[in-house]
Regions:
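Residue-centric detector for conserved, function-critical "anchor" positions
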Residues: 1-42, 47-62, 86
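Mobile genetic element proteins and their domesticated derivatives, centered on retroelements
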Residues: 18, 32, 43-46, 54, ...
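Basic, flexible linker segments flanking DNA-binding modules
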Residues: 54-147, 152-153, 217, 222, ...
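Mobile-element integrase/transposase regions
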Residues: 74, 85, 105-106, 117-174, ...
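A generic structural motif
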Residues: 167, 180-181, 346, 381
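Acidic/histidine-rich, metal-coordinating catalytic segments
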Residues: 196-224, 245-248
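Charged alpha-helix within mobile-element recombinases
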Residues: 224, 230-302, 306-317
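C-terminal, beta-rich DNA-binding module of retroviral/retroelements integrases
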Residues: 287-418
């Protein structure tokens, strides 16, 4: 005799008890259907099966039979083998996409996830956190950009790097993604300058309260908007508002974005055979950022853009680390346990006692500035670099210095000459 599951047998016996009462006319058939929670049509079908086959007629005939939708055993083994041998470190969503793209396997995501869970390859997801309301996106690209870094083993070999990412709040489009040794003032400035040169000036920047973004006098407390970091000073010069985030939940859009990066980029780098930062950054720039945006970017709520094209010629100066120094009597300034010698200037006999600015550029060269004048250019270790001779213009020496320093464009000087 065919083995009947205990649960199925118990269910059939309960149905039988109700049907016996209906057969004995203690209750009507529609009352029996109401007790069992089924329709009158199903009740008639069960009554016919019971009269013809007895208790066995009440069993679900699908029980114990393989579903016609069931995957062939060979295909099931192929999926498990692919995950075990080739995609062992992929998350389920990423693995499912590869099955469709690379192997022409079109089972549903949920089915693939259940197969991997049943085989013990992945664990069931943790219980979700309490519901939080999502902040609406900004309607236009360029209104708000997120910047953050993710410290992770991107090569899965014990080496830790920061992935520095800038994304648009309106579309989740990635404008910049590069691996760096650490998230710092210099790497953040390089990223922001890249976006401004490629896209234009944006309205606001949303970030955590790391020391290169904000001064926070008390740990966990509010930021001090009166004191500005080097990044804060650069953003103020460009008219970009900086908005601090006070919790990981407040940075939810960026945090979710990094979960996606951590679940995909290490595996993509492994498949591409990339093991170093230089090639990884080239891969990101030339290939992966575009693929990522095609899959995860969304359309903005409104047409248009909030980016404003910039004609500024002084981005080298803006995106530099600036230090104020007092010129000593011998026309030198202190720098990094050494001195920088200011060369004689035709427009002033001595600069002793003047306050000057040392500009530490992203390429690690140094410049000394006094107002609109450049007083010298140096390597990182203080070696003097030769400067090109200034071109004479009708605008005079001051405008020539301004153009060299990037405070006005060459077009402005040309129009003045005319």
């Amino acid at each position: 005799m065919e083995q009947i599951p205990a649960g199925e047998l118990e269910r059939a016996m309960k149905v039988q008890d109700v049907m016996v009462q209906a057969v004995a006319k203690k209750i009507t058939w529609w009352q029996a259907a109401e007790i069992l929670g089924i329709s009158e049509r199903s009740m008639r079908r069960w009554k016919f099966g019971y009269e013809k086959h007895g208790l066995r007629g009440l069993f679900d005939k699908r029980k114990g039979k393989a579903s016609w939708k069931r995957a062939p055993a060979a295909e099931l083994e192929k999926i498990l083998s692919l995950y075990r041998d080739q995609y062992f470190d992929f998350n389920v969503r990423h693995f499912h996409e590869k099955l469709v793209e690379k192997h022409d396997i079109h089972w549903s995501y949920t089915w693939v996830k259940n197969v991997l869970q049943s085989a013990g390859f992945i664990r069931k997801s943790r219980k979700r956190q309490p519901h939080r309301k999502r902040r609406p996106r900004r309607p236009l690209p360029g209104m708000l950009l997120h910047i953050d870094g993710s410290h992770h083993q991107w090569f899965c070999d014990g080496r830790w790097y920061d992935l520095l990412v800038i994304l648009d709040d309106a579309t989740s489009e990635i404008y910049y993604a590069q691996l760096v040794e650490d998230e710092s003032t210099r790497t953040v400035m390089r990223a922001l300058r890249h976006v401004i040169e490629q896209r234009g000036l944006f309205c606001a920047l949303y970030s955590d309260r790391a020391g290169h973004f904000f001064f926070t006098p008390k740990t966990g407390g509010p930021v001090d908007h009166r004191q500005r970091t080097q990044v804060g000073r650069a953003m103020k010069e460009l008219g970009i508002e900086m908005i601090p985030a006070y919790s990981p939940q407040a940075r939810g859009r960026g945090e979710r974005n990094f979960q996606t990066w951590q679940g995909r980029l290490p595996q993509e780098l492994r498949l591409a055979g990339i093991r170093d930062v230089e090639n990884a950054n080239a891969f990101l720039t030339e290939t992966y950022i575009d693929e990522f945006n095609m899959q995860f970017a969304v359309a903005a709520a409104q047409t248009g853009t909030a980016f404003a094209p910039t004609t500024r010629q002084d981005l080298d100066r803006v995106f530099s680390v600036q230090h104020e120094r007092m010129v000593r009597q011998d026309n030198t300034v202190c720098w990094a346990n050494g001195t920088l010698q200011i060369q004689p200037q035709s427009w002033r006999s001595t600069l002793a006692g003047c306050r000057v600015i040392i500009y530490q550029h992203l390429d690690r060269t140094l410049r000394i500035g006094y107002g609109t004048h450049q007083l010298g250019r140096f390597t990182e270790d203080g070696t003097v670099l030769a400067e090109s001779q200034p071109q004479r213009t009708v605008g005079g020496k001051k405008k020539s210095a301004q153009r060299r320093w990037g405070l006005i464009s060459s077009k402005t000087v040309t129009s003045a000459a005319r």
